[in-house]
């Protein structure tokens, strides 16, 4: 079997794109720090992409009302960068297959908070998809 990497994409606590990430690594910068976007029950340092989901969706042209999970957004951004880096034509049929351990956790926590206060509340559709199941 032959495998060829044609393009790369990354969005992380160090930056958005291979250029920003490489510059941060070369400068010896750390992406680890206190969380700024999410509350946590424990005080631990994290590697956080410091853009909220709305801003991530805007990078992809996704309307705020249709924003998928944070994990899906990050994967789609990196995939779009990789497709662009590989100079794959816009008309080409390209798919993103993503397997994660925390997909949809942000949506699940928001749903649970609303549902717990009133079991008639919460947007079930936002957590019923494969990203959150």
Residue ranges, per PLM feature:
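Conserved "HGTGT" condensation-loop signature of ketosynthase/thiolase-family condensing enzymes
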Residues: 1-133
